[in-house]
């Protein structure tokens, strides 16, 4: 009886795994009036409302912590500069995500030496002072950074990563049960899943955000070629990197090659915007 039960469970698990394997991870999207081609994640098991609510709470906490330490929006001219660039980029985002026009966008600057910036799901942008000052960014380069981060939100990479984590945990537990590996098996499978699933998706997200980011910049009238000089600056201050296979980001050289390959598709958009 027990053997029959185990056999039935394994048959069920096989069906679950096979069904998940048939689901498309992403589809390609390209704008009707030209531009880059990027992948739009399809395998979404976490509701968008859950992701946006979680991101909004985290963003609010970060703002409150920064404000309590006197680190939020301290340099008025710097904040005005960042917001002016973001305000030109944001309207272009509806081409990649129609819902972006309904987001409650926020743009803030933290007075921290960290070289960092991000855009959370729902349009919550944060730029760190160190990014601007240590790299001595031009407006075009700053637009490349902000455009890249906005692209992550537009393409719902945060939601995709959460969905991947949920599916990975479900899959690991099912596989451990299927193979009778117990806790040790679950741990080993989780580590394998981290390398085999999470990291490749993350690298593809970065590449797509780079490409969508230069298109956003180009359509907003910022020179997309500045993304190349931006990442050369990043490489200069970044020092050594982990082996590319184990990195969640493309290597700087690979990243620059991808951007340069995408420039011919967005330069006409930049020239058109600059002529207006």
Predicted regions, residues:
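Bacterial N-terminal signal peptides
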Residues: 14-24
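Intrinsic disorder/low-complexity segments in short proteins, especially the signal peptide
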Residues: 7, 25-27
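A Zn2+-metalloprotease active-site environment signal
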Residues: 2, 27-276
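Bacterial N-terminal signal peptides that target proteins for export
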Residues: 2-16
């Amino acid at each position: 009886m027990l053997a029959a039960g185990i056999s039935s469970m394994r048959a069920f698990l096989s069906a679950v795994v096979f069904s998940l394997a048939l689901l498309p991870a992403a589809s390609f999207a390209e704008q009707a009036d030209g531009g880059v081609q990027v992948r739009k994640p399809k395998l979404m098991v976490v509701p968008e409302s859950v992701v946006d609510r979680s991101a909004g709470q985290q963003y609010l906490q970060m703002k409150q912590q920064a404000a309590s330490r006197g680190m939020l929006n301290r340099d008025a001219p710097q904040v005005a500069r960042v917001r002016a660039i973001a305000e030109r980029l944001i309207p272009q985002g509806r081409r990649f995500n129609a819902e972006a026009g309904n987001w409650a966008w926020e743009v803030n600057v933290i007075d921290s030496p960290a070289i960092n910036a991000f855009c959370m799901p729902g349009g919550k942008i944060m730029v760190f002072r160190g990014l601007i000052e240590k790299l001595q960014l031009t407006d075009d380069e700053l637009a490349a950074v902000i455009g890249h981060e906005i692209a992550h939100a537009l393409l719902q990479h945060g939601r995709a990563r959460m969905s991947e984590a949920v599916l990975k945990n479900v899959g690991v537990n099912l596989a451990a049960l299927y193979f009778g590996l117990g806790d040790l098996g679950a741990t080993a499978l989780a580590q394998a899943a981290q390398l085999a699933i999470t990291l490749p998706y993350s690298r593809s997200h970065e590449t797509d955000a780079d490409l969508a980011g230069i298109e956003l910049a180009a359509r907003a009238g910022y020179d997309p070629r500045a993304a190349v000089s931006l990442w050369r600056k990043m490489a200069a201050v970044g020092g050594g990197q982990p082996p590319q296979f184990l990195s969640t980001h493309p290597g700087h050289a690979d990243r620059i090659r991808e951007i340069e390959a995408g420039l011919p598709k967005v330069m006409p958009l930049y020239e058109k915007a600059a002529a207006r």
